[in-house]
A protein has these predicted regions:
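Short conserved micro-motifs at the rims of enzyme active sites and ligand-binding pockets
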Residues: 175, 348-351, 505-507, 642, ...
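Preference for the N-terminal adenyl/adenosyl cofactor-binding alpha/beta module
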Residues: 1-254, 298-305, 340-343, 431-522, ...
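Conserved beta strand-loop-helix elements of the APE1-like EEP
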Residues: 648-660
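Conserved SAM-binding loop
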Residues: 309
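Class I S-adenosyl-L-methionine
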Residues: 629-651
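Flexible phosphate/Mg2+-sensing switch loops adjacent to catalytic phosphate-binding sites
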Residues: 63-67, 199-228, 255-291, 317-335
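P-loop NTPase motor core
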Residues: 286-299, 329-355
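SAM-dependent methyltransferase catalytic-core segment centered on the flexible catalytic loop
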Residues: 244-283, 345-402, 430, 444-631, ...
Length: 692
């Protein structure tokens, strides 16, 4: 039950993962292009989760459970593994209490723990595509890869996945890079550790040089107070990708909590908050539960990345269990690791305008809705925005308390009640999302005058409609994180690796979106990527699809320029709008909107400081924040093996209170100044402790 120690992936493991992922995706050819990778990733996360449970000995002590079930299914019938093993395992096995499972299933699948949350949950993808037959061959590469992974990471699969999955997600539509461990450690130090030092300074009137010094000099009473404050911190990764940064943050917070608890215990257990008190049988599970539920939040636009991030945090929880029954205590990570567009959505909600929005056309009429303990939809139709926020908080707390009860009693009534309460929460969220997106559409179409290119219409452009806005998958920070903004002024910490490149249509995204059309035209993705212009010249339908796809980015770029959300990253030095917008600059500006005054931010992003077109952003940062470090790095000395030497990256950490004193900029980006992997850690330590 120790903290995860990462292992760099071997080339064999990297290739095995890619082969597994692609084989599952290719087997789902009957699905729409945009959903193939998502469902393949969901199935892959479930296979990894089963492998983690068998490695812990939770599946009847059979460490080869998956492989044995695969072999037995082939003896019964060919191509029956998906329909006869994996689907029943998830939908009638792990997610049902033992007494609810069909007897024939219990006999075939053996003793299984009850896992009410996590990768096995029933999803909309299962409802739509769970009936699609999949051949055994679709799973064979994954089973081979999982065997290799278990051999490489005998202490826990999570140790071998962090860098591998980060590399895979980053490489899907960009450069396949994984953050070097010293760099990730430095970002955690300058955010999580620095925030704890800020709290300690406020408590003791003394600035400690490091958390090591802090833990040596704290009194038990002070440690108990700081432990309470540590449990109140909130950390956001607004572009969480595979979840590696969230896992690193979890491990750092766990380590600090254990250190503070050990000191506080010397005085009296009374000084330790309830969430941090060790249980007799498990000293760390309670810490994990609290931090994963209340401290860590992630968001990503790409659904497969969200599935992988949830998986990685769930695997951490599995490592903190000591027996199968404790799996019921693992939190529902779908409440904290979310899917949506961090850059598009309302950060502040106008109460009066929300209250004036009528119900979405096509939504259920509340008078006709099936009553469940009264009319569940009525509060959103009749009540004010503030009432809706209050109702959401009540439903959220009811659901969390019910899942906690489920962890304690494990009964069928508790399990059914938890499902019911989650449905109530989802209903409320869905209707609020529709009304908030309507407000966003109204702003874009009426106030900003946005129009969408229309390659098939009589005119070059058409009015923006709400379907266009829905397609961007807006995330309304002001609604989903209202409590953090109201009570704390925002998140305490932002820790992230922002998306790279410019805001523009990509070939990878286009091929995935229109995969079915490519198959109808008998054009392979590689053919399009290497011969885009000739293909578009020849085929009218693909040309039209490409124009429609690009048009969605055109209006989105115009929104990002014209809205009042990004004045510093969308303007050039002459005060005019930038010709190109860059994802990472927009994310940086958004992050500071979400960070509380005095909060800390540590991120990786595209280099920008030395570029002339970044002057408005640079000057604003110097005025509004205390920029400690802006560090440009290049790959000329192979910080990231196997990717081009021209690859560059910027590491930045700051505190959200300005102004900046002195110059924070340092560059190791030219061939003659680039850092080798073994030199990176030393340079980072000198930046963190400049007088050391």
């Amino acid at each position: 039950m120790g903290l995860t120690v990462e292992q760099p992936p071997t080339p064999t493991l990297v290739q095995g993962f890619q082969r597994s992922w692609q084989t599952l995706t290719d087997a789902l050819v009957s699905l729409p292009g945009s959903q193939r990778r998502h469902y393949a990733t969901l199935l892959l996360t479930r296979l990894i989760a089963v492998a983690a449970l068998q490695q812990r000995g939770y599946l009847g002590g059979d460490e080869w459970y998956l492989h044995n079930q695969f072999g037995q299914s082939q003896q019964r019938e060919l191509d029956g593994f998906f329909s006869q093993v994996l689907q029943p395992l998830c939908q009638q096995g792990f997610t049902l209490p033992a007494e609810e499972r069909p007897p024939a299933l219990r006999q075939r699948l053996g003793p299984l723990p009850f896992v009410p949350t996590g990768p096995f949950r029933f999803t909309e993808l299962d409802q739509r595509w769970g009936h699609v037959p999949l051949p055994d061959a679709a799973f064979e590469p994954t089973l081979h890869w999982l065997a290799d992974l278990a051999a490489a990471a005998p202490a826990g699969l999570d140790a071998g996945l962090g860098m591998l999955l980060e590399q895979a997600v980053n490489g899907y539509d960009g450069v396949a890079m994984a953050t070097p461990a010293p760099l990730l450690g430095a970002l955690c130090d300058r955010t999580i550790h620095a925030t704890l030092l800020d709290r300690a300074e406020a408590l003791t009137n003394h600035r400690y040089r490091s958390t090591e010094q802090l833990l040596k000099e704290l009194s038990p009473a002070e440690a108990g107070t700081l432990l309470t404050e540590l449990g109140q911190l909130t950390l956001l990764d607004p572009a969480c990708g595979s979840g590696r940064f969230l896992v690193a943050a979890l491990n750092q917070l766990m380590e600090l909590a254990l250190g503070l608890r050990a000191i506080a215990t010397q005085n009296s257990a009374k000084t330790i908050p309830n969430w941090a008190k060790p249980s007799p049988n498990n000293p760390t599970l309670g810490l994990y539960q609290h931090l994963a539920t209340h401290a860590l939040y992630g968001l990503d636009l790409w659904p497969p990345a969200v599935e992988l991030a949830r998986l990685q945090l769930w695997l951490q929880g599995v490592q903190h269990t000591s027996q199968p029954t404790e799996l019921t205590a693992l939190p529902d990570l779908t409440l904290t690791v979310l899917q949506g567009n961090a850059l598009v959505g309302l950060v502040r909600v106008d109460d009066e305008r929300f209250d004036q929005v009528p119900p979405r056309r096509g939504a259920k009429d509340p008078e006709q809705a099936v009553p469940l303990q009264g009319n569940l939809l009525q509060p959103l139709i009749a009540d004010s925005y503030q009432s809706v926020l209050g109702e959401r908080q009540v439903r959220l707390e009811h659901y969390r308390s019910q899942t906690q009860l489920l962890a304690e009693v494990g009964s069928v009534p508790a399990y059914a009640q938890a499902d019911f309460l989650r449905d109530r929460l989802d209903e409320l969220d869905a209707i609020a999302q529709g009304k908030l997106t309507h407000l966003l559409w109204s702003e874009g179409s009426q106030q900003l005058g946005l129009r969408v290119p229309d390659p098939t219409g009589d005119r070059p452009t058409r009015p923006l409609n709400q379907t266009d806005v829905d397609a961007t998958q807006p995330f309304h920070w002001g609604f989903y994180f209202h409590q953090q903004r109201r009570d704390q002024g925002g998140f305490d910490i932002v820790l992230s690796h922002f998306p790279r490149g410019a805001v523009e249509a990509t070939q990878v995204g286009f091929v995935e979106r229109y995969a079915t059309l490519f198959e109808q035209k008998n054009v392979t993705p590689s053919t399009f990527r290497h011969n885009r212009q000739p293909v578009l010249t020849i085929d009218h339908d693909l040309t039209q699809a490409w124009a429609e796809y690009r048009g969605q980015f055109t209006w989105l770029s115009n929104y990002l320029r014209r809205s009042d959300q990004y004045p510093h990253s969308s303007l050039g030095p002459d005060g005019l709008s930038q010709n190109r917008l860059f994802w990472s600059r927009l994310f940086l500006e958004r992050s500071l909107q979400l960070l509380r005054p005095g909060g800390r931010c540590g991120v990786l992003l595209d280099p920008f400081w030395a570029q002339s077109n970044s002057a408005p952003l640079r000057h604003w940062l110097q005025r509004q924040t205390d920029l400690a470090t802006v560090l440009d790095l290049s790959n000329h000395q192979k910080l990231w093996p196997d990717i081009p030497s021209r690859t560059t990256l910027c590491a930045l950490w700051l505190r959200h209170q300005g102004p900046t004193q002195g110059s924070p900029y340092a560059a190791f980006s030219k061939p003659n100044t680039a850092l080798a992997p073994e030199a990176l850690g030393g340079v980072l330590q000198r930046l963190i402790h400049p007088t050391g």
